[in-house]
Each structure stands twice: as structure tokens, then as C-alpha cells.
């Protein structure tokens, strides 16, 4: 099993969602709002914490857990949709999941 994490600008969520849903066997995803800190801001010199906190930018994080074969297809689909953007628009990574349990409540 693999976990895919995708961090994108909020405006790109719909485009990524459509590409992922088009993959046969799409298992669903978790989406949450996060803040990113651009690398360039850390190189701009000494700042106060208050100034640094205002430099965070809104992003959306997508998390998907899927079988190895499906995860590769989902990863490739997301890369294809996002690879033509600007630097800093998105980040995608995939890691191994050693064990997972999906709990379902019934009744």
C-alpha cells in the first residue's frame, strides 16, 4: 500500500480532483486546508515571528491511501495535471504504508 500526499493551491483542487476521479478504482481522498511557508521567505533575512507568520500562504492537502498499482496510476495522473504549473504551486509525494485498517461503522 502507498499513501499519496498532494499539496496544491486551492484553485487547483478541482482540476486534481477530476483527474484522480477519472482513474478506475479511485478509492476516495481526504482534503484539508493547510498553510505553506515559501522557501524564499526564509532566505529574506531576519524577521520577527509576527512578520514570519504573515508570510504563510494557503494550500490544500490531499491524502490518498491505495494499493501499489493504483497509487502509481493516481500519482502519475496528478503529476500530469500539475506539471505545467509555476514553481511552488504544488508538491506531490508517495510513501509506503506498512499497515492500515479501514474502519466501517454499520447499523
Label each residue range with its predicted role.
Residues 1-107:
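Positively charged, small/polar-rich N-terminal and surface patches that mediate targeting and assembly
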Amino acid at each position: 500500500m502507498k499513501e499519496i500526499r498532494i499539496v496544491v493551491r486551492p484553485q487547483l483542487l478541482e482540476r486534481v480532483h477530476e483527474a484522480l476521479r477519472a482513474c478506475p478504482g479511485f478509492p476516495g481522498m481526504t482534503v484539508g486546508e493547510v498553510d505553506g511557508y515559501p522557501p524564499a521567505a526564509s532566505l529574506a533575512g531576519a524577521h520577527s515571528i509576527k512578520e514570519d507568520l504573515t508570510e504563510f500562504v494557503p494550500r490544500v492537502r490531499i491524502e490518498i491511501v491505495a494499493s501499489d498499482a493504483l497509487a502509481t496510476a493516481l500519482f502519475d495522473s496528478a503529476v500530469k495535471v500539475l506539471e505545467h504549473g509555476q514553481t511552488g504551486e504544488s508538491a506531490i509525494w508517495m510513501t509506503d504504508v506498512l499497515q492500515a485498517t479501514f474502519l466501517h461503522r454499520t447499523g
